[in-house]
Swiss-Prot record:
Disulfide bonds: none annotated. It holds the Pfam family TCTP. It comes from the Eukaryota. Residues 1-170 form the TCTP domain. This is Translationally-controlled tumor protein homolog. Gene3D superfamilies: Metal Binding Protein, Guanine Nucleotide Exchange Factor, Chain A. Belongs to the TCTP family. Keywords: Calcium, Cytoplasm. Involved in calcium binding and microtubule stabilization. One of its GO terms (cellular component) is cytoplasm. The gene is tpt1. It is found in: Cytoplasm. Coiled coil: none annotated. It comes from Lateolabrax japonicus (Japanese sea perch). InterPro entries: Mss4-like_sf (IPR011057), Mss4/transl-control_tumour (IPR011323), TCTP (IPR034737), Translation_control_tumour_CS (IPR018103), Translational_control_tumour_p (IPR018105).
Amino acid sequence: MIIYKCIISGDEMFSDAFKVKESANGIFYEVDGKITTRTDNIDDSLISANASAEETTDCTDSSVVSGVDIVLNHKLQETSFDKKSYKVYIKDYVKAIKQKLQEEKPERVDAFMADVAEEVKEILNNLKNYQFFTGENMNPEGMVGLLDYREDGTTPYMLFFKDGLLAEKC
């Protein structure tokens, strides 16, 4: 299995357990997800108590969680942006990715910088369509994944900047 981690925060963003493809210009990974509902039950046998000494038996509560499987599996945390705050974030994020690329993959810098401006403009034009998710540690300098839905309105997918990720085999 391959886990994709943010190169800035080290947070897990997604894995190859999902359908992953590159966007047309290769700047994003598009990760297809599914809406799922999970029940988190607590095993009563794990609660240390003498059941025979109890007068009444209380059942432990279970919780039901619904959401996109990518978000739930990798414990992504929802955050929010308006146009102004996203511009501030993305400017700093692109600068950080450019710096990392200069250190580790200098041949990618020009292509990344050429493509990112056009993609950011597209994101800003459709900002109202996206939900934003950070990694589990909610590092404000780390990657923010963009959640949107396909044309059918029911199939969720997320966009992650390819150059902001480190692929790690498990």
